[in-house]
A protein has these predicted regions:
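Exposed loop/turn and edge beta-strand positions of beta-sandwich/beta-sheet ligand-binding modules
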Residues: 11, 16, 28, 63, ...
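Conserved hydrophobic/aromatic beta-strand scaffold that supports enzyme active sites
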Residues: 17-22, 66-68, 97-99, 105
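NAD(P)H dinucleotide-binding glycine-rich loop of Rossmann-like/cofactor-binding domains
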Residues: 36, 86-148
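Glycine-rich beta-strand-centered segment in the early N-terminal region that forms part
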Residues: 21-38, 50-92
């Protein structure tokens, strides 16, 4: 399968389109046929070598992906082949297929595109977590989101 891998921490020219083996889901994972993948601030930092916890090179980029469940691990019982999901992924979302833990998979509602669902996976959950657990707005308070840029 095709995948985009990072070959060094030297910028965008370090991204390479390569052929790799399709990942196999472990017992609690699903295999996703990727339809959309996000580009996050952390990935941009990683490409430039500024990410605080770099992975060993080369590796497939992409912390999140949306797509169709193509296969199930032996103990993955809460999803079925053909389900539309978005998830933080185990094996890199910039590929034709990626694996994800079933506990991280979020079903995509009817009428929501893969790209739209993907937009809430990391950025949306980060914003929600900061708002609800750090800011903790009260019922009589208002919240202004002035910028949503990385």
């Amino acid at each position: 399968m095709k995948a985009v891998q990072l070959s060094s921490f030297a910028g965008l020219n370090s991204l390479k389109l390569v052929e790799i083996d399709r990942p196999t889901p472990s017992k609690n994972e699903v295999l996703i046929q990727v339809k959309a993948a996000g580009i996050n601030f952390a990935e941009l930092q990683m490409i430039s070598g500024r990410y605080p916890a770099p992975r060993p090179l080369p590796f497939t980029m992409g912390f999140e992906a949306s797509g169709i469940v193509a296969a199930l691990g032996s103990e993955a019982t809460n999803l079925k082949v053909g389900d539309r999901i978005t998830s933080i992924v185990s094996s890199g979302g910039y590929a034709e297929y990626a694996t994800a833990d079933t506990n991280m998979a979020i079903p995509i509602p009817q009428g929501v595109t893969f790209a739209e669902a993907n937009a809430i996976t990391i950025q949306g959950l980060s914003a929600y977590t900061l708002l609800m657990f750090a800011a903790r707005p009260q019922p009589d308070e208002s919240v202004l989101v002035q910028s949503a840029a990385g």
